[in-house]
Amino acid sequence: MRNTRSPLSLIGMLLVLTIALSACDATKRVPKDRHLLRENLVYVNGSKTDDAKINNFVLQKPNSYILGMPISLYIYNLGNPNAEKDFAQWIDTHPGWHRFLKGLLSEKQVGRLQKSFLVSGIDHQLQRIGEAPAVLDTARVHKSTKQLGAYFRSIGYFNNKVTDSIFTLPKEEKQQAKVSYNITTGERYYLDSLKTKITSPEIDSVYQLHKSKTFLKSGAPYQLSDFSNERSRLYELFRNNGFYTFQQSSINFQIVRDTVAAQKDTKLQVTTDIGDLIERDGDVITTKKYKVHHINKIRLYTDYDNKVDKSTLDSIQYRDMLIYYKDKLRYRPRVLYHATSLRKGAVYSDMERGNTYRQFNNLRVFRYPNMEFKYAANDTLQNKLDANIYLSSMDKFSLRLTNEIKRSEIEAIGFGIGTSFAARNLFRGAETLELNFQGTFASQPTLKDTRFFNTSEVSGDIRLIFPSIVFPLNTRKLIPYYMTPQTILQGGMSYQTNIGLDKRTTSGLLRYVWNPRNQKNKVIFDLINVQYVNNINPGNFFNIYQSTYERLNDIARKYSLGSRYVDSRGNLTPSEGTFNFMNDIFEGTLTIQDEDILPLFGVAERYRRITNNDFIVASSFTYIINSKSQFFDRNFSQLRFKIEGAGSLLNAIAATYKVVNSDGSTKNKLFGVEYAQYAKAEVDFIKHFPVSKQSYLAFRSFLGVAIPYGNSDNIPFSQSYFAGGTTDNRGWKAYRLGPGASGSILDYNEANMKITLNLEYRFPILGALKGALFTDVGNIWNVADDTRFDKYKFKDLSSLKDVGLSTGLGLRYDFNFFVIRLDMGIPTYDPAEPIGDRWIKKFRIKETVFNFGINYPF
């Protein structure tokens, strides 16, 4: 039985705390001659603006409010900032207590006592998790005024005027004030004529070839960011076209405008000025024309040690690269050559330099490489560069061990062990061999097996990774090395004992991975993905899937049945009676009423789907577009496409291996097992929208559908979709929503189509503690398969009325490197209820679903 007291007690405590905090004095820690900043008001040309970009230029922010109260400030005020000083004064004025404590401890320990947790630790903790009062700082107000003026000048309002005003609030809100910033923008300036002044002919020729990509456009409003972007573009352009010594400081923009506001001439004349190279030698400054640099010699040092004399190393020439090594070259020269994007005679390029770093990292056998460029010996013109690449190898072998303690509703206690072994540079081509083993051993008291650890799951896999595309045809033009390609060949097995139906799973995979265009996007191409699932103990089905058993038992209890079917209480025996009951009905030796036939077929269909041995041979293509520019990117977006097909290859190979099933249909088999045939497509989109400096909206949408055809009437259980759970529709537990309006009557409800929409507002509460408000919409349906029940099916857009909608709130504690998450989801619109009764009418805590997870759901 679910315990509802704990959540109710928590809500009661929060309510009491809220009432107590509301009685607090917000200005308790504000000096008497100062004011608490209550609000910033920003007006642009007389109209109030809430534009986050503009408001962010106001340096001082008021304290944060939750439910109309500055709770973080109240918590801070509960702490005494002078706890140590007050304790020292108390000791001085109470000599008796001083003597007692000195006798109990020592004089030094009494002095340290004021820094202890008992004396000042609680106060420090309250102030650490709380928020200090935003005491109005007039210096920061005036600085904010200057920053606002600078911002509007940066977007073309050169004649703007910004003033600030401070308003103290009425006495009932003592020592509180608001600040008003009033901005008059004036006319905006626009770019007019665009000219260039370039002293180096070689620089000018490159500029002219790429000038169409400029950020500066005639007629566009002045934007300082456009000039910054143009400077970065030109710097990258020249550095990637041979100008090794090019300095960003050589790029300047001369902007001429009418400084007399009364003239109202808002056109700007812009000259892009690219000067010469400036070199400093002490106090001597010289200038030189920029010139193109070419790569001369390329030297690569494997297993480099700066303590070893380079002259003692052996070397080998491979194409235009000289490879140095000690004693024995452990890597194929071809692999090292292709990992290097630099080529003799090519112009110097920062991009190729970066590609070389990435490609060596992709080999996974070297630590981060070191690279240096020097002028070639006897190069009096100084336009030839020798490239030296220094590599340091990782350990040939590595071993990692893991362990964990487990507990669940099924398993009383258990432990898991794992080991991972890696062998690098296996065939001298930077290949990596990985061996992984996982074992979980647990105790399940309900089993007849009397051993303490009576359940287990053991799995192992072997993986071979090649740092290139391994394919009979040459793919280098289609997938060059700068896309950091990989080929993964993997095989694995898992073995369950006394868990569910005791599955034995065998899998194999040939996968290609590469990063097109930039390192953010990713392609995953599974040329072949084989999976065989063998259920060893299907007779245990009705012991595991209790909801399905109850449905069948409810049908059986309507009839007078003998010991062949039921026990002394009249219930079907799970191991034998259930199967005898279904078989005898299908064979005609036992009859039931017509109204029970369809539910019985549903149970039989469920049994067949879950106990079927699955044989899947699939191919898939996944493309991921990722905009993430930094680890904490609040403008993050990601779009993932996936298409998958299974069974077509086997259908061509095994066309002659046909069997006739009892229903008269013809199915192909391979190795005695019917193989799956289906087509699958998925689209997943995630987008984050900043709302303020510390809060943002997170949106996710998902659409997936898998259509069986040919050799299959439905898709395998392992390839189906489910709804509910910690990262999906949080008002329902996993597998407890759908399909459609069916009411989720089974233990594990799944289907072959899924639609999900999630919207979540994330905001700060106290320090590392964050909050969230969310809405989840979606469901699963059956489409184009052999499902008999209309409530399960997606027929047309009218079926969208059967989505489930949940709302809720969550708490997250951010440890920087991971997040602990607790979400409380409420089923707000339940498709299982009749039309007209689906919206929640009364909140009940027992219907709330608590979801615990690690990291954000999307």
Language-model segments: residues:
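C-terminal motif of bacterial Sec signal peptides marking the signal peptidase cleavage site
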Residues: 20-23
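Interaction-mediating elements
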Residues: 25-362, 479, 497
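Outer-membrane beta-barrel pore domains and translocons
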Residues: 167, 273, 339, 343, ...
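Outer-membrane beta-barrel initiation region
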Residues: 289, 294-479, 596-599, 605-635
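Repeated loop/turn-to-beta-strand initiation elements of outer-membrane beta-barrel proteins
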Residues: 366-369, 396-399, 425-433, 468-474, ...
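Hydrophobic, lipid-facing positions within transmembrane beta-strands of outer-membrane proteins
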Residues: 385, 413-419, 456-462, 487, ...
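C-terminal outer-membrane beta-barrel translocator/porin domains of Gram-negative envelope proteins
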Residues: 406-409, 524-763, 774-777, 781-790, ...
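Outer-membrane beta-barrel "beta-signal"
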Residues: 813-817, 844-858
